[in-house]
């Protein structure tokens, strides 16, 4: 069976926490650190053989190691997200064929979604967890000029994003060659004109960005664990 790796990104600087939370990845959420939720979900999924965790400093690495799968390779993160991903890709074992890339600041990913993504990537080479946008989105073109975008074609990208190892390594090499700034991995693959499949996520999978997000994530976890259905509007 083809070996699969998971790159768990934990090296973010928590800049938008405005000092309220020193390290959002280690912040307590439903009785355990934010990082532990993603780590345990990937373990339960049974689709990952190799774990790589990017970290921001030695103290954080020690704390992360208490919740990381065994064994895990820890790799120092870079200044930006793309630098951390590139550093982790460079450390992949030679026999890895597929790669999950996941922001640990999204702790609500589900094991069944990982299984579905793993099945799709073996067919498509590139797949991203995503959801459709329901808000009206406008592009601001300056001087009060707005352009309404057709939301039927708009999706919000989430993580995990999953790729064949050869494809994502080629894509990140193209990013480095052109000295581009990207904020997700699918953007790198787009440079190669390679199609990216989307797996629609019907469940909330928000990213922890501000202090207020912690309370929202706690609420979502409580609803999920108690199996109380989400209201439909």
Where are these regions (language model features)?
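Residue-level signal for inorganic ion chemistry
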Residues: 8, 35, 88, 102-103, ...
